[in-house]
């Protein structure tokens, strides 16, 4: 059992949790939810013994084996499969002991170790590791490739597989779907449903949470609130609790007003002074119930487009690719006002390539793309977060689009996206990934597009913002094409699903559950093909061709790999600076008046490191995305 009792956690001067209490029973699967920055990841860091509590206590069995996803993956020469097996630390220890016993020819030790290996099912570990990697999207050929060959997103999948292979009692997962496509999300959901240990899962994907968790811990107002059931059940229970809280608050405010009125009237009258004083004490003793904040903090909608030409966009026999590699071939697509299309397809099939083609970021190799007069594109992709001007605020970004508008109108509009008070005029260099994503969306919505192209728009967004975006998209009058691993968003906002597969883009006859079955069928076919003898693959010429292709791919990707390595070194340096600054800020004596200059310098160091780290991370993400795309294309040829 995990017990948090009167827990207090600070980050510098900011209190994240105060007198927070919660209990998690063995075997429970808990969804940890709350707004960005409320302390969810910090709570996991506490359980991992990376930080200490500032007050209160927490306990869990000392014998428990913990597993979590490492955030760093060095460019190792080790094979992917072996790297994943490293996640089972007991197996690796026994393996080393067995090697040593064999060297010493110690028969008794060998027998004892074999017994321990039998007990942990060690003989199946390679097949279990391969199964995890297949589920996360790796091909058989990739299992023996060195870790250094993979881009950042794929290395995060390796880290996830490493955490899953550990025979853990407690599994801690912080946004595990962020680097996954829909196929891998569906597979991970099945795996976690069958997991036998205790799970604490942070996710902003309600459709991912619902079938997995049986309890929700919601962090808000520096407290932890416990709810039995899945996320959908939590929503209903919380709404009920807040409604009751609001009713209590309103009733209490009537009582407070009555008492205050009495005090104001009779405080100065000698004959009534004693009664007034008793009312004052009563008022002070009353526990003030905070007003319930039921409303979503994000409020925005798409204004009607200025024009809705029909069709908005038309593609005829369009082919697309990179260099001499064709990714999509002979595409036919017609987008009209009201088209609401969700793109499905396996990783590397070409979904993002199609979005770039529609957005004009990628020129077709052949065929024609017809754009209507008056078309206005709204295009969202992760790399666009980089295009924000680091030295400008949200208000300055929006004012550039609307120079004639009153500043108050722009401020009111930005408030609907969570930019209020000083945040409206803060430089974006200090913004988190979620804040940058909200600002890019705000700029898109302002421009009244009639064709929206969204490539994974929910990455970095919390549940409240995802819900606000979903509601706004439902009311959008133009055409929509979206790629997302958020199934709730896909179900709620799209009418038609298109499958990107085998270089084709075609309507998919079915829903997301049917797509899940399609994935399963394709995987079975591929497994059967892998098991069949391949005379050609064993030929000397085939091996020679394979080596040639691998050498060409290494040469093509070498400049990107060097840039990624440079950025990783820079991020490591900035992380060290940030950690140093935050360690200093955690010292309460630093806030003494006589150390004001030191505090200011420390805060400046923290801000500078955060800003530099954010810029580095965005450049790293774009480089990783380019490398990932090149590697995927290389594997498909």
Curated annotation (Swiss-Prot):
Keywords on this record? ATP-binding, Nucleotide-binding, Repeat
State the phenotype upon gene disruption: No visible growth or ribosome-associated phenotype.
Q: Which SMART domains match?
A: AAA
Instruction: State where ATP binds.
Output: 34-41, 345-352
The annotated regions of Basic and acidic residues compositional bias extend over: 542-553
Q: Name one GO molecular function term.
A: ATP binding
Protein name (record): Probable ATP-binding protein YheS
User: Domain ABC transporter spans what residues?
Assistant: 2-246, 313-527
Q: Belongs to which family?
A: Belongs to the ABC transporter superfamily. ABCF family. YheS subfamily.
- Could you tell me which residues belong to the region Disordered? 523-559
Task: List the PANTHER family hit by this protein, alphabetically.
Answer: ATP-BINDING CASSETTE SUB-FAMILY F MEMBER 1, ATP-BINDING TRANSPORT PROTEIN-RELATED
Query: Is Repeat among this UniProt entry's keywords?
Result: yes
Q: Does the keyword GTP-binding apply?
A: no
Question: What is the documented function of this protein?
Answer: Genetic data indicate it may be involved in ribosome assembly or function. Ectopic expression exacerbates the cold-sensitive growth phenotype of a bipA deletion.
Organism for this UniProt entry: Escherichia coli O6:H1 (strain CFT073 / ATCC 700928 / UPEC)
């Amino acid at each position: 059992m995990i017990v948090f009792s009167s827990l207090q956690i600070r980050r510098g001067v900011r209190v994240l949790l105060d007198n927070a209490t919660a209990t998690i029973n063995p075997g429970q699967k808990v969804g940890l939810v709350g707004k960005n920055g409320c302390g969810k990841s910090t709570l996991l860091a506490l359980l991992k013994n990376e930080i200490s509590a500032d007050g209160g206590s927490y306990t869990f069995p000392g014998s428990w084996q913990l597993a979590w996803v490492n955030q760093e993956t060095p460019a190792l020469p080790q094979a992917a499969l072996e790297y994943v097996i490293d996640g089972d630390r007991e197996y690796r220890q026994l393996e080393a002991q067995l090697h040593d016993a064999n060297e010493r020819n110690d028969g008794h030790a060998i027998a004892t170790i074999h017994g321990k290996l039998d007990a942990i099912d060690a003989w199946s570990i390679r097949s279990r590791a391969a199964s995890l990697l297949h589920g996360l999207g790796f091909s058989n050929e990739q299992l023996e490739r060195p870790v250094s060959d993979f881009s950042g997103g794929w290395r995060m999948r390796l880290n996830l597989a490493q955490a899953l292979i550990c025979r853990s009692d407690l599994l801690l997962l912080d946004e595990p779907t962020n680097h996954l496509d829909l196929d891998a999300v569906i597979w991970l959901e099945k795996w976690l449903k069958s997991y036998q240990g205790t799970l604490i899962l942070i996710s902003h994907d309600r459709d991912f949470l619902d079938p997995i968790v049986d309890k929700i811990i919601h962090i808000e107002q520096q407290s932890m609130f416990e709810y039995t059931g899945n996320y959908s059940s939590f929503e209903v229970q919380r709404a009920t609790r807040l409604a009751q809280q609001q009713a209590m608050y309103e009733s209490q405010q009537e009582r407070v007003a009555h008492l205050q009125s009495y005090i104001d009237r009779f405080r100065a009258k000698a004959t009534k002074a004693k009664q007034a004083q008793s009312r004052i004490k009563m008022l002070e003793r009353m526990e003030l119930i905070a007003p319930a904040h039921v409303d979503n903090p994000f409020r925005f909608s798409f204004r009607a487009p200025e024009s809705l030409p029909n069709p908005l966009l038309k593609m005829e026999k369009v082919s697309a690719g990179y260099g001499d590699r064709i990714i999509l071939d002979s595409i036919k697509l017609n987008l009209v006002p009201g088209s609401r299309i969700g793109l499905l397809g396996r990783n590397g099939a070409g979904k993002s390539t199609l979005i770039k083609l529609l957005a004009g970021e990628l020129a077709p190799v052949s065929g024609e793309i017809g754009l209507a007069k008056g078309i206005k594109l709204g295009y969202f992709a992760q790399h666009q977060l980089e295009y924000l001007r680091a030295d400008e605020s949200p208000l300055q970004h929006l004012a550039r689009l609307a120079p004639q508008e009153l500043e108050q109108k722009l401020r009111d509009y930005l408030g609907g996206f969570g930019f209020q008070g000083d945040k409206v005029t803060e430089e974006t260099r200090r913004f988190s990934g979620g804040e940058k994503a909200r600002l890019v969306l705000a700029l898109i919505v302002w421009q009244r597009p009639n064709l929206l192209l969204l490539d994974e728009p929910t990455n970095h967004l919390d549940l409240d913002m995802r819900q606000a975006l979903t509601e706004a998209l439902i009311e959008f009058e133009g055409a929509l094409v979206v790629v997302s691993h958020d199934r709730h968003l896909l179900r709620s906002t799209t009418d038609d699903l298109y499958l990107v597969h085998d270089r084709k883009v075609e309507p998919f006859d079915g829903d997301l559950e049917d797509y899940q079955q399609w994935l399963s069928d394709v995987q079975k076919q591929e497994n059967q093909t892998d098991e069949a003898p391949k005379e050609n693959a064993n030929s000397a010429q085939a091996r020679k061709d394979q080596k040639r292709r691998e050498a060409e791919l290494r040469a093509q990707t070498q400049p990107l790999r060097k840039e990624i390595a440079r950025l990783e070194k820079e991020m490591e340096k900035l992380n060290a600076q940030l950690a140093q600054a935050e360690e200093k800020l955690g010292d309460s004596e630093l806030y003494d008046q006589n150390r004001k200059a030191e505090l200011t310098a420390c805060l400046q160091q923290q801000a500078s490191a955060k800003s530099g780290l954010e810029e580095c991370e965005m450049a790293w993400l774009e480089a990783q995305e380019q490398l990932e795309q090149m590697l995927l294309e290389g594997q498909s040829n």
